[in-house]
């Protein structure tokens, strides 16, 4: 993505959040892996995060659709929106839960299923545990009840 294209998308993203009417600080960064990271600081974050981050997920999908329409260049890019470090904290929590569950599976040699999670949350767990040679992970179930199963490796 060119610097000019990024500036155009950055402006569109700021306008998107200005239309909420909420008191927000929005910082937008272009990351090396074609990801546009949108960091939002809000006085009332609950309106943007929602229950279990569902509103935040929908805002991210809507913003992605808006920016893809504004993009002149068909170069693919990703959008990552975080509000008051909600996703950052959630990711750290998920990594901790994943490692704890994996340790339990490695010791007991019994499978363990984690609670239902969004696709983003499942990806965090799979990525966190991918380098462990003693366990394997797989997603099971149907949306919205999809979850991660952690299994011992022989």
Predicted regions and their residues:
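RNA-contacting regions in translation and RNA-metabolism proteins
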Residues: 1-154
